[in-house]
Amino acid sequence: LNAELDGDKAIIEKFLYDSKVDRNKTTMESLLKNGQQRYGIVTSDGTIVDGNRRAMLLNRLFYKREELGYSYEEVEKCKYFLAIILPDDAEEKDIQQLETIYQMGEDDKLDYNPIEKYLKCKELKRLGFSEEDIAGFMSEKPSQIKEWINVLDLMEDYLKEYDYEGIYTRLEKTEGPFVDLENYLDSYKKKKSNVRNADWAYSDSDISDLKLVCFDYIRARYEGKEFRDIAKTGKDGSIFFYKDLWEAFLHQHEVNTPVDAKTVEELRLEYPNEDLSILLKKRDNEWIDSAKGQLKGNLQRFSRKLEDKRASNK
């Protein structure tokens, strides 16, 4: 999308507004009452470094005032976005550093989508910043930055698995299971002490199978105890700890879990004018509807068998 084109700008502003409707309504009330209280930051060519959401809300209040029921006098203070302009010689690396410090290193970083911190780490690494540098910008520990980068790698594997590469909106409300899964997979790969009770010598291929099975359950929006029963580490273990349970569970999963009726490319060709995010959400929902009975039934059966294993080991 090109923010300089009116059509693309409208799409971007709609996305920003819809992503945090309640929060945006509260901010709009504040802007109406008090005006803009904090300056934004803008590059010399007009790119907003800090303040995209506020700029969008100011535009919305001023240019949609009649639709929203406000008079010119009520929204006059919203006519302009007040900002500090960066010098002409500011480089991309400098801009990204400044943007991160302002957006992710302050208390209001909670305003941002959880996935954004992962993408910001990736971008800063691309620009050559170390994990220690990024940690300083974000007021985090280097170990946290390393974990976020690893979790994003896992998220991107997930997107590739379903032909959603680069479409990060499909990760909405999945952060928790991905964080858990990354920790589980890391423990299995490194054979840490928290997997010593596993009763078989699993291979890298088995770990890969585990990852793909968990991807299907994440896609179906499983989390909490049900999700943890598949791969959890620690003294209580999980289905993956027991060779007989895992192989039977995996077989049932592979045989009975349906595949998508259409590829992403087929959907794009069939509905060329439809919003891609809507198409993909519909695709996921249709798959969930067809798969949820099998996923739920298989997991419940083997969770009961897992409880029996745990009881017999006590």
What spans do the regions from the language model cover?
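Short, charged/polar connector segments at secondary-structure boundaries
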Residues: L1-E73
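Eukaryote-biased activation of long, low-complexity terminal tails and linkers
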Residues: Y217-W246
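N-terminal leader or domain-start segments enriched in small/polar residues
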Residues: L1-R23, F137-S143, E147-D186
